[in-house]
UniProtKB/Swiss-Prot annotation:
Taxonomy of the source species: Bacteria, Bacillati, Actinomycetota, Actinomycetes, Mycobacteriales
CDD domains listed in its UniProt record: OAT_like
Keywords assigned: Cytoplasm, Isomerase, Porphyrin biosynthesis, Pyridoxal phosphate
GO molecular function: glutamate-1-semialdehyde 2,1-aminomutase activity; pyridoxal phosphate binding; transaminase activity
Pathway recorded for this protein: Porphyrin-containing compound metabolism; protoporphyrin-IX biosynthesis; 5-aminolevulinate from L-glutamyl-tRNA(Glu): step 2/2
Name of a matching Pfam family: Aminotran_3
Catalytic reaction(s) noted: (S)-4-amino-5-oxopentanoate = 5-aminolevulinate
Gene3D superfamilies: Aspartate Aminotransferase, domain 1, Type I PLP-dependent aspartate aminotransferase-like (Major domain)
Similarity comment: family membership: Belongs to the class-III pyridoxal-phosphate-dependent aminotransferase family. HemL subfamily.
Name this polypeptide is given: Glutamate-1-semialdehyde 2,1-aminomutase
Subunit structure: Homodimer.
Residue(s) carrying N6-(pyridoxal phosphate)lysine: 272
């Protein structure tokens, strides 16, 4: 796929060329390279509110929000102030701080977990939660779902979503058969497949791990009380349920996805919003299980920068701002974006369905809702690249992959939505005119 680089991306092109000589693919996370859509990746210089500004001075309405964390938009004054205050007192101590305890209290107050361990990334959170589940149950097998992405953990990359879906990789070289031999993969939203797996491996499965709502194969909501049924099946066999709320946590509601379906999983992972946009994440769960972690128990987990005081300050400030009224605004903005996208595509006669999981959304270029990874791939995905690039050329920054979720912030204005509406007209036309290769 080719897409012409226009003159107003000259500095991005220059820096991308330099980056490719120093960094694999020129990026530090694959989807940023525009690999599935082609064209010139934009190097962002700064952002304020709902606006991204690249190194060439181009401005974009941001519908990525750093892949979820920026609920209030970029550089919110209260978050900036909290970070500035933390920085002057020291960047890292390698010792306990009051802020760590207060952030843990914030998480416990809003979710079903009783205890929390802070880490540095969503990948660390899911890796640690799986290790803890195995240690607690004294079992080795784990069950995951096609299209659900839980970070680049070796055992969890089998049939993963996100960047793995974008680049059509079933897993990754460098991961041995031994590392995935205890990973059972079944279709998402298929409760009978889960029951069959437990029937085939009775007493062997340590945990089920699932995204609380799918966000890495496009947006796919759990259906028919799926998470509640997972919990019941796991407990009936002595296994645990891990719900990955790295994406949905404090994004989809005040209490995350737990606030929507009230399923109290044994272990829950958090990231993105809880970090305030800095490198931080967490996992938590029932005290009986969490107390298996060192130094209280035998399951080892550690991190030099875990609970970093600057990241903790950003996370606490973000959660303080994220009250119930904020979600009313974000949900309304998601509904408004949903309507604009659907109206534009309908006007051009493009078959589509807007996938929703609360205020998270994506586009399936086919009729009807997708309920699993196979459904999401069985669409006119070739329409997305021209749709994306036309939006980008008209000042709207959407996720550069059909398999990624769109995020809105409370910072979006009427002017932003007017810009989005105008950009969607030629974008929908480009999608309609696209041809399968």
């Amino acid at each position: 796929m080719t897409h012409m680089t226009s003159s107003n991306t000259a500095r991005s092109a220059e820096w991308f060329e330099k980056a490719q000589k120093l960094t694999p693919g020129g990026v530090n996370s694959p989807v940023r390279a525009f690999g599935s859509v082609g064209g010139q990746a934009r190097f962002i210089e700064k952002a304020h509110g709902s606006t991204l500004i690249d190194v060439d001075g181009n401005e974009y309405v941001d519908l990525v929000c750093s892949w979820g964390p920026m609920l209030m938009g970029h550089a919110h004054p209260a978050v900036v102030e909290a970070v500035q205050k933390a920085v002057v007192d020291g960047l890292s101590f390698g010792a306990p701080t009051i802020g760590e305890v207060e952030l843990a209290q914030d998480i416990v107050k809003r979710t079903s977990v009783e205890e929390v361990r802070l880490v540095n990334s969503g990948t660390e959170a899911t890796m640690s939660a799986v290790r803890l589940a195995r240690g607690y149950t004294q079992r080795s097998k784990i069950l995951k779902f096609e299209g659900c992405y839980h970070g680049h953990v070796d055992a969890l990359l089998a049939s993963a979503g996100s960047g793995v879906a974008t680049f059509a990789l079933p897993d990754s070289p460098g991961i041995t058969g031994a590392q995935t031999s205890d990973t059972i993969v079944v279709p998402y939203n298929d409760i009978e497949a889960v029951r069959n797996a437990f029937a085939e491996y009775p007493g062997e499965i340590a945990c089920i791990i699932a995204e609380a709502a799918g966000g890495n194969m496009g947006t796919v909501a759990p259906k028919d009380n799926f998470n509640d049924k997972l919990l019941a099946i796991a407990h009936a066999d002595g296994a645990l349920l891990i719900l990955d709320e790295v994406m949905t946590g404090f994004r989809t509601s005040y209490r995350g996805w737990f606030g929507i379906d009230k399923v109290a999983a044994d272990l829950v992972t958090f990231g993105k919003v809880v970090s305030g946009g800095l490198p931080a994440a967490a996992f938590g769960g029932k005290a009986e299980i969490m107390n298996m972690l060192a130094p209280q128990g035998p399951v080892y987990q550690a991190g030099t920068l875990s609970g970093n005081p600057v990241a903790v300050a950003a996370g606490r400030a973000s959660l303080k701002l994220a009250d119930e009224s904020l979600y009313t605004t974000i949900n309304a903005n998601a509904d408004r974006l949903h309507g604009l996208i659907s109206d534009a595509l309908t006007h051009e006669g493009v078959a589509h369905h807007i996938q929703r999981a609360s205020n998270m959304l994506s586009i399936r270029f086919a009729e009807g809702e997708g309920h699993n990874f196979s459904d999401m791939k069985a669409a006119d995905t070739f329409r997305f690249a021209p749709f994306f690039h036309t939006l980008l050329d008209n000042g709207v920054y959407a996720p550069p992959s059909v398999f990624e979720t769109w995020f809105v912030s409370s910072a979006l204005t009427d002017d932003d939505f007017s810009k989005i509406e105008q950009a969607l007209k030629p974008a929908a036309r480009a999608a309609a005119e696209a041809k399968a290769s």
